[in-house]
Amino acid sequence: MLFRSHNDKLVGTDTRGVTVTADTAVRKQRTLPFHIRLIQGENNLRAVAISTARIEGKSVELRMTFNGPQKQAILHLIAVGINQYQNSALNLNFAQPDAAGILKFFSAASSSLFRTVKITELFNNGATKTELLTKLQSLKGTAPEDVVIVYLAGHGESVGADWYFLPHEVVYPERPEEIRQKGISSQEIKDLVMQIGAKKVLLLMDACKSGFALQAFSARGVDERQALAQLARANGVHIIAASTKDQFASEVQELGHGVFTYTLLEGLQGQADGSPKDGIVTVRELLAFVEARLPELSLKFKTERQYPVAESRGMDFPLAAIK
């Protein structure tokens, strides 16, 4: 299979007559046409063939600089927060307020960085499987220079080696067949993220066992942190999951938020602005801040530390300008 990336983000795969042969075998050349929309500045294009045994062939890279009209990025934000499930026994306290807090921050704080902010909110009974998948599919049309943030807050559950985000209509999470039918699998999320047109993508998951989602993206038996690194490397995205595959995401009444989202907001509001301290919070600064701060804050309000799972691949980019 042939994998193609643009500035470290996977932009497509192809199996059209692609084979990986030993060095001693007779080699055949095949030309495959592709169309890639360049962004302002440096563009790094890479192609590599990978065998069914996941052995990489020799990659080919092409670097070019595009000096076209300067375009300011559009921020596309999808925020999902489910407090109220069809089965009220599943209700949460802070998933919807957490998503609303993320929406409020980016609506007010990032106007200097983005030409406009396009917001999609899916709360409670609006957060159905069909609606969420439709909104994620719409991101395929985003421009390469744009920024995409997808935030998911609600229940998460694992079935076998797969993790599922549970939309509003899930009633019986203890039934594997219902989870498979009504839940949104980690594989579906991965496939849709790969299709996003923007080259700057941040995925935030505030759900129980969300670290398990990242293990499901890779081969069975692979450690979740290795799996997360593979996912980010394959798709060129930055990802933060609230908890490991064995942990529950914490909600704290005193904070008015889940600990994970409270930590995110602390970082975005300026505490993550570190190296360099320039009044701008970048995605990598936010990842580093959450990794250090979340265990500390969760221990303060709970009896044990909550550890996020985070990985960064692709270009760094600004998220917030500190006023």
Regions found by a protein language model. Give the residues of each.
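Short, small-residue-biased leader/transition segments that mark boundaries at the very start
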Residues: 1-2
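Functional beta-strand-loop-alpha-helix junction segments that form "active/interaction loops"
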Residues: 12-13, 17-37, 55-63, 99, ...
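Caspase-like (clan CD) cysteine peptidase catalytic core
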Residues: 29, 39, 74, 129-153, ...
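Low-complexity, Pro/Ser/Thr- and charge-rich linker/hinge segments at domain boundaries
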Residues: 61-82, 174-176
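Caspase-like cysteine protease fold
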Residues: 65-68, 273-323
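Glycine- and acidic-residue-enriched helix-capping/strand-helix junction motifs
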Residues: 86-104, 252-255
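Extracellular S/T/G-rich loop segment that most often corresponds to the catalytic His/Ser-adjacent loop
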Residues: 201-262
